[in-house]
């Protein structure tokens, strides 16, 4: 059984952070609290409006970050590593890492607890995806159509979020992305979470 949820702008929570504005797309559980760090996973997009900003301390969580438009220069003081992050490239790091970001952009974030393993990809027109993650997110960067095995054909508008939750981990989800206005830039961001069984 596959459960599908489609969320739009009215479902998202917008708030300020030290470097700009953040839009919370999804928080699990819905009764959780991001500020108190009481949640399993969180998907968000944010504007980075300062030339230099410091990432929030999210100790106990793992993070994936992707710029949706501009190149970022990241300094990870915890690992003494510099990264030049091109748009639509995922950057994996620990929530406890001390990171300074240089450059302004709009970014896409997935934060998740130790109970999950996360992935993130930028999706182009006519691309096919075959993934077995139990929880999958598709964030539309432009109007597009999503079709797939076990899925109805869905038209997503720019800024909408599609959440696909599968009960059977064994079955891979085959998804096809297409747009009436083909372009070079990615159509969507895909993110997936696999639940890690407790030992």
Q: Each PLM stretch: what is its role?
A:
Residues 1-199:
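Jelly-roll (double-stranded beta-helix
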């Amino acid at each position: 059984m596959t459960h599908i949820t489609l969320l739009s702008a009215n479902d998202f929570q917008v708030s300020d952070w030290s470097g700009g504005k953040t839009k919370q797309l999804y928080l699990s559980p819905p009764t959780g609290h991001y500020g108190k760090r009481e949640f399993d996973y969180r998907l968000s997009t944010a504007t980075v409006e300062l030339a230099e900003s410091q990432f929030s301390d999210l100790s106990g969580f793992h993070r994936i970050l992707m710029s949706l438009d501009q190149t970022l220069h990241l300094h990870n003081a915890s690992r003494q590593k510099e990264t030049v992050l091109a748009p639509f490239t995922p950057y994996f790091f620990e929530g406890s890492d001390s990171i300074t970001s240089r450059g302004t952009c709009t970014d896409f974030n997935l934060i998740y607890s130790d109970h999950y393993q996360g992935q993130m990809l930028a999706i182009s027109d006519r691309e096919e995806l075959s993934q077995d993650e139990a929880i999958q997110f598709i964030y539309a960067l432009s109007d597009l159509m999503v079709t797939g095995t076990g899925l109805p054909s869905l038209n997503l508008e720019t800024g909408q979020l599609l959440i696909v939750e599968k009960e059977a981990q064994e079955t891979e989800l085959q998804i096809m992305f297409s747009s009436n206005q083909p372009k070079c830039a990615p159509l969507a961001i895909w993110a997936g979470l696999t639940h890690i069984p407790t030992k």
